[in-house]
Regions:
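Glycine-rich beta-strand-turn "strand-cap" elements at beta-sheet edges
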Residues: 2, 37-49, 72-105
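Intrinsically disordered, low-complexity regions enriched in Ser/Pro/Gly/Gln/His and often acidic
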Residues: 15, 47-53
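Active-site-flanking beta-strand signature of metal-NTP-handling nucleotidyl enzymes
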Residues: 2-8
Length: 105
């Protein structure tokens, strides 16, 4: 398994729009590109950390061309909500002891 850690700095008063666009884009990537999903965490009022899981680095690197046309609009909205988007880490999983019993929301 492979994981990518992202950091998003969101513009004032754009948090709800950002979260909605992030959810929509993440769902599309999961459905069409073979990701294993992602989690979004709030760091500060306008800063978020997400990690996305993939079967392997190659699947992640080759993703992007299978998305439906509406993904471009969702991506544009998400980017417009942010002052900065960066990849903090690209990580190969050594051990996985994470279990999810409940979902947030």
């Amino acid at each position: 398994m492979f994981a990518v850690i992202y950091k998003f700095k969101v513009k004032e008063d754009m948090n709800s729009e950002f979260i909605q666009a992030w959810k929509q884009l993440t769902q599309l990537i999961y459905e069409y590109e073979g990701s294993l999903g992602s989690r979004l965490h709030k760091e500060t009022d306008n800063s978020y950390i997400a990690y996305a899981q993939w079967p392997d680095k190659e699947t992640w690197k080759n993703s992007g061309d299978k998305l439906p046309d509406n993904a471009n609009e969702v991506r544009r909205i998400m980017k417009e909500c942010c002052t900065r988007i960066e990849i903090l880490n690209e990580l190969d999983c050594i051990e996985d002891l994470l279990k999810s019993k409940t979902k947030v929301n």
